[in-house]
From Swiss-Prot:
Oligomeric and partner information: Monomer.
Classification of source organism: Bacteria, Pseudomonadati, Pseudomonadota, Gammaproteobacteria, Enterobacterales
UniProt entry tagged with the keyword Nucleus: no
Entry's EC annotation: 2.5.1.19
Gene Ontology molecular function: 3-phosphoshikimate 1-carboxyvinyltransferase activity
Domain of life, per lineage: Bacteria
Active site per UniProt: D313
Protein name: 3-phosphoshikimate 1-carboxyvinyltransferase
Organism this protein belongs to: Klebsiella pneumoniae (strain 342)
Binding of phosphoenolpyruvate, residues: K22, G96, R124, Q171, R344, R386, K411
Pathway: Metabolic intermediate biosynthesis; chorismate biosynthesis; chorismate from D-erythrose 4-phosphate and phosphoenolpyruvate: step 6/7
């Protein structure tokens, strides 16, 4: 297996221009495909997940052109639901941001489409979304294991009253919301249980509004969406930088700055993960906000005990930043780590112990006490981009760290390690 050893880093200082947001890129691509008119997306993320969405749209007959660096995409809208001319199988890798929204959108009208992916995708639950779509009339079959992909979709979604469980993934609700305006009837979505990752729903609602569709959001408990609508291209749309990707650089600044500045996001960002910077501030770092940047400067970091449900992806970065904080850090209400690219609670606990931390792994929380000195370790990444990026922070100690399968960052940030090296001075 390929590996990358990072030597100890004495200091980080500099500016990182963030790649486009994965969450925004894939939502914007799908809405542009469903819309009337041509949409030019700029600062689109070039990564595995986005390529899976682009390949799927192409197979569904959507016309688009990509710039040489794949960050500018001109999409010719379909002016309504996507149709496959014949039976079709779409391979979506491990891209939840493609699998969930397409599973819903392809239930409009009549299709015969199979959605499948990598082995890990077949372990990521989708039953709550399928249940909700079936309530609206969709015909969906599980081809292997009940409640998991691969799925066979044969259209039929009409709208009406549907109930969706919000406790596992906000992507299920995102998928329903984006599909509902094109259904023949109005859709009323009731949320069962606690809605996780609410800020990701805000991204969805913001993008739908950008494409001309308003949703009646009743305190995140009920969403009313009028049927028979059409998305309208906004013309040009700039994809903001990825706030989850920003977390690694901001944390590096907090631990070993200097000052690290990330551009492409700022105080007006639609992504909830920018709130990660508030957590660093709470731990003792100095944070500066601009319209198009966030900067973080080193401070004496202290442990925190916090509910992280609002920033589940960025919260992983706090788990490794906790290695540099005084005291025991507790991250709570993070059950949905277990259904991501890997079981992230198990993976994080396992690898933190390798570098010497004392870790308590609960069903939906993790408690981390750093060692006096970090130990050298080879870090397993579980084919999970965020594990690789989180554990790169171990190099901010006086101990090297080896990251196994470093190329798994291609899911969201292919040149992550180059960008980290650019702002680093080795010890």
């Amino acid at each position: 297996m390929e590996s990358l050893t990072l030597q100890p880093i004495a200091r980080v200082e500099g500016t990182v221009n963030l790649p486009g947001s994965k969450s925004v890129s894939n939502r914007a691509l799908l809405l542009a495909a469903l819309a009337r008119g041509t949409t030019v997306l700029t600062n689109l993320l070039d990564s595995d997940d986005v390529r899976h969405m682009l390949n799927a749209l192409s197979a569904l007959g959507v016309q688009y052109t990509l710039s040489a660096d794949r960050t500018r995409c001109e999409v010719t809208g379909n002016g309504g639901p996507l149709r496959a001319a014949a039976a079709l199988e779409l391979f979506l890798g491990n891209a939840g941001t493609a699998m969930r929204p397409l599973a819903a959108a392809l239930c409009l009208g009549s299709n015969d489409i199979v959605l499948t992916g990598e082995p890990r995708m077949k372990e990521r639950p989708i039953g709550h979304l399928v249940d909700a779509l079936r309530q609206g009339g969709a015909q969906i079959d599980y081809l292997e294991q009940e409640n998991y992909p691969p799925l066979r979709l044969r259209g039929g979604f009409q709208g009406g009253n549907v109930e969706v469980d919000g406790s596992v993934s906000s992507q299920f609700l995102t998928a329903l919301l984006m599909t509902a305006p094109l259904a023949p009837q109005d859709t009323v979505i009731a949320i069962k249980g606690d809605l996780v990752s609410k800020p990701y729903i805000d991204i969805t609602l913001h993008l739908m509004k950008t494409f001309g569709v308003e949703v009646d959001n009743q305190s995140y408990q009920r969403f009313v969406v009028r049927g028979k609508q059409q998305y309208q291209s906004p013309g040009d749309y700039l994809v903001e930088g990825d706030a989850s990707s920003a977390s690694y650089f901001l944390a590096a600044g907090a631990i070993k700055g200097g000052t690290v500045k990330v551009t492409g996001i700022g105080r007006g960002s639609v992504q909830g993960d920018i709130r990660f910077a508030d957590v660093l501030e709470k731990m003792g770092a100095t944070v500066t906000w601009g319209d198009d940047f966030i900067a973080c400067t080193r401070g004496e970091l202290k442990a925190i005990d916090m509910d992280m449900n609002h920033i589940p992806d960025a919260a992983m970065t706090i788990a490794t930043a906790a290695l540099f904080a005084q005291g025991t850090t507790t991250l709570r209400n993070i059950y949905n780590w277990r259904v991501k690219e890997t079981d992230r609670l198990f993976a994080m606990a396992t690898e933190l112990r390798k570098v010497g931390a004392e870790v308590e792994e609960g069903e939906d929380y993790i408690r981390i006490t750093p060692p006096a000195k970090l130990k050298y370790a080879e870090i397993g990444t579980y084919n999970d981009h965020r594990m690789a990026m989180c554990f790169s922070l171990v190099a901010l100690s006086d101990t090297p760290v080896t990251i196994l399968d470093p190329k798994c960052t291609a899911k969201t940030f292919p040149d992550y390690f180059e960008q980290l090296a650019r702002i680093s001075t080795l010890a």
